[in-house]
């Protein structure tokens, strides 16, 4: 009985090993570069696009649908012309998608609805904060002082810096 069970265990381990990978498509790209960022080619299109700052999962699905790409398809399986189409669409700031899906609505200078990605988003957010500081809005003043901006409590939470400790009265 001992030998028979040992043989079964061995065969179970062999059965648990994953099957050898099938021959991969020669055109498969393991790294796809979009908006100056390397994306993992083994991920589905919306998930890979969500690695870009400024594009979430929902926007990734919307972009795939807009470009007639199958959302379950891996981004590395796309042809060169499809990748170029995707690059142009992502790097274009004005999307033909619903306004609520975009991250920079009613831009102050032009009034357009934009979706910014990567460094464009970082630069624009910093410019918006500097504008608030310049016009001395409540939020701008809070930013200047390094306080919380969105109405959170400041008395008990969010403390940082060195603790002062308790000072005793001198007798």
UniProtKB/Swiss-Prot annotation:
Record SUPFAM superfamilies: S13-like H2TH domain (SSF46946)
Classification via PANTHER family: 30S RIBOSOMAL PROTEIN S13/40S RIBOSOMAL PROTEIN S18, SMALL RIBOSOMAL SUBUNIT PROTEIN US13
Family under the similarity heading: Belongs to the universal ribosomal protein uS13 family.
Gene3D superfamilies attached to this UniProt entry: 1.10.8.50, 30s ribosomal protein s13, domain 2
Region (Disordered): 1-22, 142-171
Keywords recorded for this protein, A-Z: Ribonucleoprotein, Ribosomal protein, RNA-binding, rRNA-binding
Entry GO CC: cytosol; small ribosomal subunit
Pfam families: Ribosomal_S13
Cited InterPro entries: Rbsml_uS13_C, Ribosomal_uS13, Ribosomal_uS13-like_H2TH, Ribosomal_uS13_archaeal, Ribosomal_uS13_CS
Protein name as catalogued: Small ribosomal subunit protein uS13
Biased amino acid composition, Basic and acidic residues: 10-22
Composition skew (Basic residues), residue ranges: 142-158
GO terms for biological process, alphabetical: translation
Gene responsible for this protein: rps13
GO molecular function: rRNA binding; structural constituent of ribosome
Quaternary structure and interacting proteins, as annotated: Part of the 30S ribosomal subunit. Forms a loose heterodimer with protein S19. Forms two bridges to the 50S subunit in the 70S ribosome.
Role: Located at the top of the head of the 30S subunit, it contacts several helices of the 16S rRNA. In the 70S ribosome it contacts the 23S rRNA (bridge B1a) and protein L5 of the 50S subunit (bridge B1b), connecting the 2 subunits; these bridges are implicated in subunit movement.
């Amino acid at each position: 009985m001992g030998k028979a069970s040992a043989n079964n265990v061995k065969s179970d381990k062999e059965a648990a090993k994953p099957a050898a990978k099938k021959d991969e498509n020669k055109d498969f790209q393991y790294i796809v570069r979009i908006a100056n960022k390397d994306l993992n080619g083994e991920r589905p299109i919306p998930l890979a696009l969500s690695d870009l700052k400024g594009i979430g999962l929902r926007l990734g699905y919307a972009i795939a649908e807009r470009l007639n790409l199958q959302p379950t398809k891996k981004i590395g399986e796309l042809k060169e012309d499809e990748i170029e189409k995707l690059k142009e669409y992502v790097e274009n700031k004005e999307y033909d998608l619903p306004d609520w899906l975009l991250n920079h609505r009613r831009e102050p200078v032009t009034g357009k609805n934009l979706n910014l990605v990567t460094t464009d988003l970082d630069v624009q957010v910093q410019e918006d904060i500097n504008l608030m500081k310049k016009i001395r809005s409540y939020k701008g003043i809070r930013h200047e002082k390094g306080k919380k901006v969105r109405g959170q409590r400041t008395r008990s939470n969010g403390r940082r810096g060195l603790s002062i400790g308790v000072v005793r009265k001198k007798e």
